[in-house]
Amino acid sequence: MNVSTTPYQNARLLIDGEWVESQTTEWHDIVNPATQQVLAKVPFATPDEVNAAIAAAQRAFQTWKLTPIGARMRIMLKLQALIREHSKRIATVLSAEQGKTIADAEGDIFRGLEVVEHACSIGTLQMGEFAENVASGVDTYTLRQPIGVCAGLRRSTSRP
């Protein structure tokens, strides 16, 4: 894949398992810092699109929270396999959009894989604690359970 000669396209939003064209009027150019070539345009999602994504995530959570830990782990292992399978392509794209060497981009991918591998061990991380006889005839226990939807937001350093 030659990112430097690939024409850019507008990125779409993934909402409720479907790729959606954004209705926004604000777009962010992803620029190769070495060539100043626009690689892609990424939408600043509209409030309605953000709300639709949140609502979809909340609906999905109702199933996810009932999914056995082993099944969740298999999903994360599949993600790990897909990242490994496509790591060269991902590194090429990272290199072009961030102006870093392929080796540095591959290091980023490796660090990301470490996070995924950590998530694969969630079964042992979700074990609660049990304390016997904390008071006369009273035992206590804690449970670790998924609590809901969260979002990761990052500041764009190149937004006007």
Language-model-detected regions and their locations in the chain:
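Glycine-rich loop-to-alpha-helix module at the N-terminal edge of alpha/beta enzyme cores
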Residues: L39-Q126, G137
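Hydrophobic face of amphipathic alpha-helices that form TPR/SEL1-like repeat modules
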Residues: M1-A34
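Residue-level signature of catalytic and energy-coupling elements of molecular machines
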Residues: G17, Q36, R72, V116, ...
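Conserved small-residue-rich beta-alpha loop and adjacent elements
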Residues: E129-P160
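A short local loop/turn or secondary-structure capping micro-motif enriched for an aromatic residue
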Residues: D29-I30, P47-V50, P160
